[in-house]
Amino acid sequence: MAIRYVFGRAGRGKSYFVLEEIKKRLEGEGHHKLFLLVPEQFTLQAERDLIGKQALKGIMRAEVLSFTRLTHYVFNEVGGITKIPINEIGKNMILRKIADESSKDLSIYKSIAKQEGFITKLNDLICEMKQHDITPIELTMEFNEMEEDTLLKRKLNDIILLYQKFNNYLRDRYVDNEDNVNLLIENIEKVQFLEGAEVWIDGFQSFTPQIFRVIEKLAEKVKNLTITFTMELKSKESDQDLFHINRKTYLKIKSIAQRLGLEEEIIDLDRNERPVLPKVQEICHIEKELYAYPYQQYTGEITHLDVFSGSNLYTEMENVAAQIIHLVRDKGYRWKDIALVSAGLEEYSMILKRVFEEYSIPYFMDEKRSIMNNPIVELILSSIGILARGYQYEDVFRFLKTGFGDLNKDEVEELENYVLQYGIKGKDYAVPFTKGFTNKKHEEIEQEESDEIHEEKIKYNEFRERFIAPFLKFEKKIYRKKKVGHITKALFEFMKDLNIEAKLDQWIEELREKKYFEYVNENTQIWNKVMEILDQLTEILAEESTTLKEYGRILEAGFLACEVGVIPTTIDQVLVGSIERSKSHDIKALFVIGVNDGILPSSREDGGILLDHERESLDKKGLSIGNTLENALLEEQFTIYSALSKPTEYLWISYALADQEGKAQRQSILIDRIKKLFRNLNIQSDVVPTLNRQLHLITTPISTFKYMTESIRQNIDDKPMEDIWWDVYQWYSNESQWDERRNLMVKGLFHENQISYIGEQKARSLYEHPIKSSVSRLERFANCPFSHFVTYGLRPKERKEYQLSNPDIGRLFHDSMENFTKELVNEQIQWKDLTREQSDYFVEKVIDEMVPEFEHGIMLSTHRYQYLVTRLKRISKRAMWTLTEHIKKGQFVPMGHEIIFGLEGDIPPIVIELESGEKIYLEGRIDRVDILNDEDGNYVKIIDYKSGSKEFSLSDVYYGFQIQLLVYLDAVLSSQSQKYQAEVHPGGIFYFKIDDPMVKTTEKAVKEVEKEINKRLKMKGLVLKDVNIIKKIDEDIGRSSSILPASLTKEGEISKTSSALPEEDFKALLKHVRGLVKEIGEEMLKGNVKIEPFKKGGDTSCKYCAYISICQFDHSFHENQYKTIKELKNEEVLEKIRKENENI
């Protein structure tokens, strides 16, 4: 028995040496077995290399194995497995069950144990402990020796509990991979197939203590054992850190060999010149000097190394793709000669796929893919969630949107709209839908029901029945059955009822037809993977009792542990992979992307269950778990060294200056190191696009089209453009298949994103006749004509959701005010006679009556909304009593509430005649009108209730943004003048905020607090500049009013700070507003649909506009500019309006 050590730096041909030896043995006379042991993820490539490189006729005696596969070989011969094997999926599910059951006994991990990812970390830690031969007993002994109540001690307490329970659960029944290795160690000496065998171990940097024991047993059993080490036999002082882990591994193996008394042989490939693949000087220099201190600098010409700096991730990938095309097209490379690796592949993945497809580069992404986002997994977890959480919206539509239910995509979207609008959830699915199909008393609409409503009702209930039918069967099967086995069986039958397997096959066929072979490969495995998980779940937890919620968490833990590997669909393609994981065949060119600070080398996060310093603390006490931060950094350093030394002819290293969100990124220290190693290195970049760089991007028709478009756009914007792009444009012009796309491009380049007018004919066809307009419609047009066009011309409908919006709350306030007034009329109570107790009683009464019917009972649907009802009552009580006190303090009396003016209203509309003779009828609803009839004349006061803050601005009135109160005043003045056959005068126009403000107090008297509240509820607006009228609105005015925005001087005159206007200015304002309405009406009927929002200071009309995604207003377009509004002072407004009247 002998052991051989094969030494050599990266690229010295160690693997080639091993394969060559195996070839010689196969060609020789012997009949003994030959085994090549490699890491699990490299077995496929090693098999290919063994078959392909050696040109052998047969390899029956030689096999490529991982240590896991070796375990299976041993057990197949000697037996020994009397327990049920469980994989990582099964372990995760068991640990989830244990963690949930142990929640009360945990201290540090009580809440953390419920988080996604904890179980995976716990499983990893237990695996490490088993691999390092650390048992719960050893941990307990260490725990007992700890004196201080440290965080580590409390962590160990939880870990010991979970670890022990896990082992107890497995004992006598199950065996995991780590226990299998222990069984392997016990059984190696019994097997016959290893008698006289030769074993080569290649591709490892280090081993766990468990695997060291396996190697020890192999060394005792086999004829020859050969192990390769990527390191120099006598490393230079400068390379000590680089080969530190490899050297430790070698010394450990050597000590085993010496203890066994094996014959040792050293093969040093660094000294023995061998016919390995020659490499270019630049790659050789990197291999020798990357981590050498001191280092030698390369001073020659650099032709086989490029370092590139991209503006962002996308341009970095575009330049990578262009260079790959260059190598294949101009240098004669095959796709398979090229590999691309990254330490941040997740961030690049989607960009890479898109760019490579644009450039028609065939590629294979070597990665394990989580199945968590697969539709079948989504279907299973959402189905369990539906029953566990009682048909909640998220679970129901997570299920339906998988596409494997009995509703098609359009039906799902229709049902979702209905469910969101009426708040369908829980038990609502168990009975026929009636919301939206009943009258206000929730009685079925029968004979009066329209055919359309009846059909809608039938349709939605058919959707409901098709969705819920399989769930009712599922629910019935698990009713009162709590065992995991019963639920799993019912789940399988549920999937069978849905015909999932056949639907999956059909979907895979559709993917195949669309040539999405990558997804075909992935989804072909998914059904078997799911069945494997359900089988494992039944095998290990069948008799365990659980709840549906816990069952879902256990199943999710299993799915989280499951990944699928994808097999390459063809050999000739670019290999894409993680720098840590990928093991490629011999390659000529390597692209290393994402070489940014924190990515390569990575900024290792101490995110495990045990932190690095805690591992070190245990290591000092003899409990070595191995995976310290220092080891991880050394391993990564070795990985970088191995990767950069891999190609034979060309190396590309690149990084991005900004991430996908545009945040700046720094280059890696690795870039600085490469720059130091190569004196003449010139880092290329696309930040300033040179002619050569642009020429480099002219590759394939699809990818080049985009660059051409960007360049011509620059030319249009008066920026410099290289003439080569006109030649490129000419090429596309000569290719007829590009005509449609080229024409669209030209149209897009000269797109102005502006349509001023659609014409009178179209405008008249869009808007109803006669034109009846609300004030808010006119204000919207003044804000932006395009917003008006979309709202009142196109009339899109927003998806209605079962939730209260601010307008809904405002409507509730308004309705309650109206109903309050009706109660007073019914009870024949005058406002001036109303008491506080009566006011509060009527508020309670009207709101209690309104709430059950308001928006389909939404106010009673949740505790949050029920609390809102209480708050609304409090605010309404305060508002009603404040308004009552206002009336009591003055001589104005309410003439009416919710007064409608319009063609069919309580009072006539305002009629505006346009130049064409056509008329616009202004209509609206006035919250409250008060009137004063005395010897001085008739005066009216307009009050509009607002649930939010609303400041009155004469400047906004002037521009047409706030004409509501003046239009209301105009309508009432006109109607009352006709009624009294005499002039009626404006008394005031006001906003009243419905609120119950909180007042900070330091034991103030109740009267003082009330006074402060009334001050805050003071109305805002304009009052007639007449002391007599002001006093008739507020008889208690004194120096300052608590009702309206007015105050008096010592002499009893109206102060300058008062918001008051003489009657002639009121009339001038009314005239100005009528002029605005006419102007807006003229523009509306001309078809003005300009995208022209206003900008006033820092405020714009786009701020709360729902249509910004439709108009796509962008002020970088010359035609998209804000209509800048200057804020005018009150006197400026009045001066302008007076001048208007003078000019008429």
Swiss-Prot record:
Origin species: Alkaliphilus oremlandii (strain OhILAs)
SUPFAM superfamilies: P-loop containing nucleoside triphosphate hydrolases (SSF52540), Restriction endonuclease-like (SSF52980)
Binding-site residues, [4Fe-4S] cluster: C784, C1102, C1105, C1111
GO molecular function: 4 iron, 4 sulfur cluster binding; 5'-3' exonuclease activity; ATP binding; double-stranded DNA binding; helicase activity; metal ion binding
Subunit structure as annotated in this protein's UniProt entry: Heterodimer of AddA and AddB.
Its biological purpose: The heterodimer acts as both an ATP-dependent DNA helicase and an ATP-dependent, dual-direction single-stranded exonuclease. Recognizes the chi site generating a DNA molecule suitable for the initiation of homologous recombination. The AddB subunit has 5' -> 3' nuclease activity but not helicase activity.
Stored PANTHER family: RECBCD ENZYME SUBUNIT RECC (PTHR30591:SF1)
Stored InterPro entries: ADDB_N, DNA_helicase_suAddB, DNA_helicase_UvrD-like_C, P-loop_NTPase, PDDEXK-like_dom_sf, PDDEXK_AddAB-type, Restrct_endonuc-II-like
Protein origin, superkingdom: Bacteria
Enzyme Commission code(s) on record: 3.1.-.-
Family as reported in the entry's similarity comment: Belongs to the helicase family. AddB/RexB type 1 subfamily.
Positions of the UvrD-like helicase ATP-binding domain: 1-276
Gene Ontology biological-process entries: double-strand break repair via homologous recombination
Gene transcribed to yield this protein: addB
Pfam families noted in UniProt: ADDB_N, PDDEXK_1
Residue stretches making up the UvrD-like helicase C-terminal domain: 274-584
PROSITE patterns from the UniProt entry: UVRD_HELICASE_ATP_BIND (PS51198), UVRD_HELICASE_CTER (PS51217)
Cofactor(s) essential for the protein: Mg(2+); [4Fe-4S] cluster
Descriptive protein name: ATP-dependent helicase/deoxyribonuclease subunit B
Miscellaneous comment as given in the Swiss-Prot or TrEMBL entry: Despite having conserved helicase domains, this subunit does not have helicase activity.
Signal peptide region: none
Entry keywords, A to Z: 4Fe-4S, ATP-binding, DNA damage, DNA repair, DNA-binding, Exonuclease, Helicase, Hydrolase, Iron, Iron-sulfur, Metal-binding, Nuclease, Nucleotide-binding
